[in-house]
């Protein structure tokens, strides 16, 4: 009987562990989608976003996926100009604030004032700062504290979320 009890206890612990992990995965789902309807001035329905964006753009900008490093042509672009949100065309970053972070994503040490919103991102068992367009809520990337002065910030941005306009 002791062996059966021990197996049941082990099975119960294993089940509790699986349920805990499942709860964390559900909790890690994008929060921005829930907040969009009331938070951002520019709004579209899910079907309108899908019509406006390619499937990959939709995955990154509306579902917080990440493009592979070194795949965006904007990563190596250093022409003078402005980077806009692909979702709503709001100005987000100036080329003056772009730098080569070596990470494989377009990186900026400063955004255009008021153009980028942030929130805590607790996915993948860590806390990061997610950044999004303040006008439409489209996911841009994350902000880290390892950038150059004067801000010390690195806005690590998915190039697929941006459109570049030459000055």
Indicate where each model-derived feature is located:
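Short cysteine-rich clusters marking metal-coordination/redox-active sites
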Residues: 85, 133-136
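N-terminal secretory signal peptides
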Residues: 1-11, 22
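Cys/His-coordinated zinc-binding microdomains
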Residues: 89, 137, 157-160
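Short, non-ligating residues that shape and space the ligands of small metal-coordination modules
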Residues: 94-95, 142-143, 165
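Short linker/helix segments within small regulatory modules
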Residues: 146-151
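C-terminal segment of N-terminal export signals and the immediately downstream linker at the start
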Residues: 28-63, 68
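Residues immediately within or flanking Cys/His clusters that coordinate Zn2+
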Residues: 82, 128-130, 153
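Mid-length scaffold segments of soluble, non-membrane domains
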Residues: 76-107
């Amino acid at each position: 009987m002791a062996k059966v009890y021990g197996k049941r206890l082990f099975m119960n612990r294993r089940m509790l562990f699986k349920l805990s992990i499942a709860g964390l995965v559900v909790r890690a789902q994008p929060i921005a989608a829930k907040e969009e309807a009331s938070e951002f001035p520019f709004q579209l329905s899910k079907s309108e976003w899908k019509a406006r964006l390619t499937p990959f753009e939709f995955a990154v900008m509306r579902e917080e996926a990440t493009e592979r490093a070194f795949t965006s042509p904007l990563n190596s672009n250093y022409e003078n100009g402005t980077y806009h949100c692909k979702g709503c065309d709001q100005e987000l970053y100036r080329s003056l604030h772009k730098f080569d972070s070596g990470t494989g994503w377009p990186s900026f040490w400063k955004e255009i004032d008021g153009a980028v919103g942030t929130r805590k991102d607790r996915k993948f068992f860590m806390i990061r700062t997610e950044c999004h367009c303040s006008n439409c809520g489209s996911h841009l990337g994350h902000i880290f504290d390892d950038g150059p002065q004067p801000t010390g910030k690195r806005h690590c941005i998915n190039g697929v979320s941006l459109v570049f306009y030459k000055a």
